[in-house]
């Protein structure tokens, strides 16, 4: 029989101590892993059974378009180890968060940069509300042209107008020519203007049309995947014209589902798309019947569903009156703002050139009848807390 040396004996003891000291934690890890796998399996099983229920037409709430989301949610089940932010212990990480640079897409409009702190960040839903013919699509086309001029990849989804009509509006904006004159422009001059743009713009703008009230986030995701594969196109910003005439991927449009829940579902799905693809999304909505007749309105005048402004990160109204129309101006009113204080620069006026599909800044002294504007100096993206407040009553 071999004699065990003292060193070997000590090493064996240390090894046994280590095994027994880690046994409890090892068992716990194993238990968590096995439990998580079991929960995942049950979630997938339930999702498949729900999907079969939908395919057989037995679901009164969900359509077949909801199946990918149901399965995706089941596959994403996990035990999250993060149990919250510790105010004291995580102070250093929080300080780093305060000082990290956040990517923002700026406007070419001074007051819009002021109220958003220099532009809108990714993973956000930004809504413009206006009456029929006031300028919802004009705003979206103008900002899409601005983003393209910044060499950002732009995806413009239209559920209202034809692709060529949207491109026509962006042509008018970027080529600085009225829509009427576009139709009489000679081919050589048009080609020269496009080539001039091509020499300065290296990004792409893709316009995709869907039939009204038929396209949902499911279609948009498929489009994004197709563009990435076939054109190697990944958008930096997405425009959807407009939200109320999209479809929900989860809910059926029926008498059993009220407009509040249906429009809220669409808004939540589109905001989820912004988060998933790490882009800001711009869209629009109509005012309701009472708001259409008013020269000023608020969130309560949102058409069909108050769930839309509840979901959006940024919500502004475009207001037109006969007096403003005569001055070629349009009023902007902040209704919701997660980027800044919505009470500072609450109202302001922009110049509008409808023939060229353009918006532009106007001089401060030209802004009239803004009794509750609480305007601040927009210089340097004035975040609402620097500079002297200017609260003027023009009434």
Q: What name fits each language-model region?
A:
Residues 1-38, 394:
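Noncatalytic partner-interaction/assembly domains of nucleic-acid and motor enzyme complexes
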Residues 24-87:
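Interdomain "pre-motor" coupling segment immediately N-terminal to P-loop NTPase/helicase cores
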Residues 116, 146-234, 347-348, 361:
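Cytosolic-facing regulatory segments adjacent to core modules
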Residues 160-161, 283-288, 321:
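A short beta-strand-to-loop transition that corresponds to the Sensor-1 phosphate-sensing loop
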Residues 218-235, 254, 272-277, 289-395:
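C-terminal regions of RecA-like/P-loop NTPase motor modules
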Residues 239, 280-285:
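Structural recognition of the conserved hydrophobic beta-strand(s) that form the central parallel beta-sheet
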